[in-house]
Regions:
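Conserved phosphate-binding/catalytic loop of the ribokinase/pfkB sugar-kinase fold
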Residues: 100-128
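Divalent metal-dependent hydrolysis catalytic cores, especially in the metallo-beta-lactamase
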Residues: 25, 41-70, 86-101, 127-139, ...
Length: 343
């Protein structure tokens, strides 16, 4: 050990890779679709304080010109090298516009589109190839063809904002879909005769599944059900956090529309509009709701999102030669220390 080295000890804590959030729209008063250096820096700096080392900048459905402009701006920002002490935007999650009108949530209906390979290619090129993940409703005409095309271009497909039947869901899986977006939310409910997308998500061993574990989007009992179904290899926690995260209650923006935030709930038109959750709190909530072993729970914010996105050679593990991005957490999942980007 070099003479100048400092030894840091955190008794009772567990060392783990820094967290990876594959579904986040913003924080600290900024929406990532602003695609400005100031917005990205504010979000990335805040995430680092919550133990996040890497994230996918997530879009929301918007008019075509707005989406293209945001993707072009994000691509330029993602071309820059990572900054010490800030979470690294390692790619883009395209959430919309290929979503169901029936399960759109707060995504503006006028900007929703049916799956179209040419439109996707415009998005992909505008984003400089940084689209790593795309949410897609399997039941839409052309969804399977788009899933296969996007998969061939290296984009992982997550099924969500969907009213799909079980058969439609399995068709999307055969075309390349690997995950489910914020399981239970904006998703056809379970039925004992037509299990739908949710039934397939919960019973397919090969599918990953996101969950927003804030106690608002999903009740603790349903978190337990999800955990028992997906287990430590296929479950992953996300925040779906929007610009109000880390800020006081008030009115904020998600994409281009206003969201009212009060007492931990982000609402637009009476519908949940993202969250103000942080990934460290999601981990602590998950442990409290399920009593899962800490080593298994940590996979949900590290190794599993890395595997789902195909980025496991870059993030999600402690390995010699990788940039030092790591966290220490106590037995309850509370963050006790973090080193992000070597700082």
């Amino acid at each position: 050990m070099p003479a100048c080295a400092r030894v840091l000890d955190f008794p009772g804590s567990t060392l783990a890779p820094a967290f990876f959030d594959v579904h986040i729209h913003g924080a600290m008063g900024h929406d990532l679709m602003e695609a400005t250096p100031g917005a990205l820096q504010a979000v990335a700096s805040f995430l680092a304080t919550r133990g996040v080392g890497n994230f996918l900048a997530t879009t929301v459905t918007a008019p075509m010109d707005v989406t293209l402009r945001s993707l072009e701006g994000l691509a330029k920002l993602l071309d820059r090298p990572p900054v010490e002490g800030q979470a690294h935007a390692i790619g883009i999650h395209l959430e919309g516009p290929f979503l169901s009108h029936v399960k759109r949530g707060v995504h503006p209906p006028a900007s929703l589109l049916e799956p179209d390979i040419a439109t996707f290619d415009r998005f992909f090129e505008a984003a400089g190839g940084y689209v790593r993940l795309m949410t897609l409703a399997p039941e839409l005409p052309g969804a399977a063809e788009l899933a296969a095309h996007a998969t061939a271009r290296g984009v992982r497909i997550s099924m969500g904002h969907s009213n799909a039947t079980a058969a439609e869901t399995r068709t999307a899986m055969a075309a390349g879909a690997v995950s489910a977006t914020h399981t239970f939310n904006a998703m056809r409910p379970l039925d004992h005769r037509e299990p739908g997308i949710l039934g397939v998500v919960l019973t397919s061993d090969e599918l990953f599944a996101e969950l927003i574990c804030d106690g608002i989007h999903t009740a603790p009992e349903m978190v337990k059900l999800w955990w028992r179904a997906k287990g430590p290899e296929r479950a992953l926690l996300v925040t779906d956090a929007m610009s109000a995260t880390g800020m006081p209650d008030g009115e904020y923006q998600l994409g281009g529309f206003p969201v009212q935030v009060a007492e931990g709930r982000a609402m637009a038109g009476g519908v949940l509009a993202g969250s103000v959750l942080t990934l460290d709190r999601a981990l602590a909530n998950f442990l409290r709701f399920t009593a899962a072993p800490l080593d298994q729970a940590l996979r949900l914010v590290t190794a599993n999102p890395a595997a789902m996105t195909g980025l496991q050679e870059q993030v999600g593990a402690l390995a010699v030669g990788r940039t030092a991005s790591l966290v220490a957490v106590d037995a309850a999942g509370k963050l006790t220390a973090s080193v992000i980007g070597g700082n």
